[in-house]
Amino acid sequence: MHYMKWIYPRRLRNQMILMAILMVIVPTLTIGYIVETEGRSAVLSEKEKKLSAVVNLLNQALGDRYDLYIDLPREERIRALNAELAPITENITHAFPGIGAGYYNKMLDAIITYAPSALYQNNVGVTIAADHPGREVMRTNTPLVYSGRQVRGDILNSMLPIERNGEILGYIWANELTEDIRRQAWKMDVRIIIVLTAGLLISLLLIVLFSRRLSANIDIITDGLSTLAQNIPTRLPQLPGEMGQISQSVNNLAQALRETRTLNDLIIENAADGVIAIDRQGDVTTMNPAAEVITGYQRHELVGQPYSMLFDNTQFYSPVLDTLEHGTEHVALEISFPGRDRTIELSVTTSRIHNTHGEMIGALVIFSDLTARKETQRRMAQAERLATLGELMAGVAHEVRNPLTAIRGYVQILRQQTSDPIHQEYLSVVLKEIDSINKVIQQLLEFSRPRHSQWQQVSLNALVEETLVLVQTAGVQARVDFISELDNELSPINADRELLKQVLLNILINAVQAISARGKIRIQTWQYSDSQQAISIEDNGCGIDLSLQKKIFDPFFTTKASGTGLGLALSQRIINAHQGDIRVASLPGYGATFTLILPINPQGNQTV
């Protein structure tokens, strides 16, 4: 009676499994066999229809092209027809991957095209064998689908005779490797097997689930709690009975955790300060929008990448990597960070990140951009210096210029009373140096003392020409070529002529001094925009070091042995008063270009 346990098992679980075998497995396998058999036939039929459609397309595209090049010798005509028809077969086979197609000419007894030509171009001009099915197609004027070995190999070949005006001119073929067809049929078989297997497994699984309902519900809750530890969004399904109450309590707990985490994420996302977190390996794990704005890097560029790649080629020492490697935490540390497009002044605070077990899993850096604040502080300090300078210059004008005037008068009297050439030369030097001191004092006064601008209509081209007259002395013209490219269509602008002339003169003198031997200076004017005009002064002198380009507009900054360092500072102030912009572009050894952008009609009259 032992075998009766298998024929009629006592346990419900085994009975359900037996029923599944009788009610699911046998019908499923039977249906699968029928579907597989019919599917293979359907695949073959579909392939035949597709190949027939391809040859019909080729036949329509052929038209009367076989009548071309009749007077050419056989080989030349084959090449000419191939050049004419190859694009057609290439386009068709490109549209139907895996298919080979071509034309055969009965008169020439040769293959005209065989696409794709990258694979079968060497078959062009070949004559098919006497027993080739294509000859039967041409002889009987009947389409034929043939499966077997031909020029390409084992293929399913659809052939169509080319008939024009009752005459057979050749045939067209389209074929596909039977291996590709078998592979497709095998894929279909695999899918059927997978579906059948999945269906059987699902059926058995359902039976097992029903037979072990209580234990399954417990497993769901247990597995859900385990998953919840790593993935808070996990939600347990609603279960019946007491298990449902437990699952609902777990879901409520998960919801509370989700809301807490969401709040934390929102705080980080909307923080004005940049936040970047890295793991133990130094790879970026988190980056908020403020960090993107400050550093210039996008989140998708950095997350998952080493944080150190931001400054691989620099001498920058990272506080957050120091925290990660040595445990040193920094608070409000001011650093210069190498951003994407610029060096950024930052206030940085770093800390370690620990998990619930107290183990360090990474480091966090919170930073704010101090660049604007630093620039504001610098400008305020500069303004204070200038205010102090203004007060100082008022005293200098009286305390220094008056004695200098007296000294100059006495020196002139001495020069008039002496006839000694040496004394005359010495006194001339004294007068020249006194005038130089007076000029420096005058520049300081002009820079520190407000001046009411004289606004009028000014032609930039005329202004450039007037200024060049002052610069093009005989000595300068001997070594510097001046090239003027002035836009004659420019209309006058509203500006202070004398102040703009002073700006041009300052820049041109600097350009001349930057050229040590022979060189050239190019001056251009053009319409910068509908409301702005521009002047550029370009020289091929020594250029300006990148580290100095931000300083050249600072008062008293100069790299020359002589000079006050006020020329460009005053020029910038004049251009700003015109509501314009002054820009510099330079590379050491390649010269410099200063560009002045001026509005045609500034809003209001500014005082310089």
Curated annotation (Swiss-Prot):
Periplasmic topological domain: 37-189
Residue ranges annotated for the PAS domain, each copy included: 260-305
GO biological process: regulation of DNA-templated transcription; response to polyamine macromolecule; signal transduction
Protein's name according to its UniProt entry: Signal transduction histidine-protein kinase AtoS
UniProt GO MF annotations: ATP binding; phosphorelay sensor kinase activity; protein homodimerization activity
Outcome of gene disruption: Deletion of the atoSC locus renders cells not motile or responsive against any chemoattractant or repellent independently of the atoSC inducer's presence.
Catalytic activity: ATP + protein L-histidine = ADP + protein N-phospho-L-histidine
Annotated PAC domain residues: 326-382
Keyword Phosphoprotein: yes
Quaternary structure annotation from Swiss-Prot or TrEMBL: Homodimer.
Residue ranges of domain Histidine kinase in the record: 395-602
Role: Member of the two-component regulatory system AtoS/AtoC. In the presence of acetoacetate, AtoS/AtoC stimulates the expression of the atoDAEB operon, leading to short chain fatty acid catabolism and activation of the poly-(R)-3-hydroxybutyrate (cPHB) biosynthetic pathway. Also induces the operon in response to spermidine. Involved in the regulation of motility and chemotaxis, via transcriptional induction of the flagellar regulon. AtoS is a membrane-associated kinase that phosphorylates and activates AtoC in response to environmental signals.
A Pfam cross-reference name: PAS
Keyword Transferase recorded: yes
Residues that span the membrane, as ranges: 16-36, 190-210
PTM-bearing positions, type Phosphohistidine: 398
EC annotation from Swiss-Prot or TrEMBL: 2.7.13.3
Family matches, as Gene3D superfamilies: 1.10.287.130, 6.10.340.10, Histidine kinase-like ATPase, C-terminal domain, PAS domain
Residues in compartment: Cytoplasmic: 1-15, 211-608
Domain HAMP: 212-262
Topological category with respect to the lipid bilayer: Multi-pass membrane protein
